[in-house]
Amino acid sequence: AAGVGLIVTEGTYVGHDSAGESNRVPRFHGEEQLAGWAKVAADVHAAGGTIVPQLWHIGMTRTPGKGPVPDAPVVGPSGLRPGADEPTGVTMTQRDLDDVIGAFAEAAAAAERIGFDGVEIHGAHGYLVDQFLWSGTNRRSDAYGGDLVARTKFAAEIVAAVRETISPEFPIIFRYSQWKQEAYDARLAETPEELEAILSPLAAAGVDAFHASTRRYWLPEFEDSDLNLAGWTKKLTGKQAITVGSVGLDGDFIKGFMGEGSPLRGIDDLLDRLEREEYDLVAVGRALLQDPEWAAKVLAGRTDELKAYDAEALRSLS
């Protein structure tokens, strides 16, 4: 596996009609799709690697009329797209919530059954689970809206349902972020205390590791501390934490989607923080797409051989 300890797949749609909008994004439900995923897991294991699927529902970011089920409604906690003031979608009912929770649980059970090594729940970047966590998209007045803990209820129920469905030793990773695709300056938590209020129910529900998504891993998350979001996550929960955000590169990843490359950025600080056990794992995206030997080179101390990112590396996947 060229030094890569764990592969997290791209986002994969769970089995809910409103989960996605692109027919080019893989689904993690259905006999044919799961047979294909079983082969992926087997091939990764044959190469000496481990792999988890990232389970995903995009919620209010979906475009009406698109996706595997075009007629399905666009749903969210309050029918609000991230960054919007007026609802354009459907506010989810209790039945809707239960259906989505069940879809995540069924996908996780399938992942274990067909040979994956764990699951990651996508709760970041302004998609459905994150839409419940963020006050900008969650205006509910029932048990799923209001204060920080109430806004975490839906995510915690997904985690609990997944945990109940899979074996106790099968790991659950929960990915979350402050920023959103439509709002880089959005924040779930302004203080460590607020972050703890969000993460504690998730940890109690069964999360084994948190994937703390930032755009630039080296930036401190709160005042008066150098800890980044992953560092605070580990400190507050005691759970394993994954850091991510422009690892090894100086350019923003969103610009990479727009066809821009990125120069290299040194990783001495990254490795120092890892050695101090501020976090436990490092997620690498564009740098690894550019150079599949990235992890092996870093582990061998051959950082002088690392390559700058060229957007052609992303286009090669399509």
Language-model region placement:
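Flavin-dependent oxidoreductase catalytic cores
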Residues: A1-S318
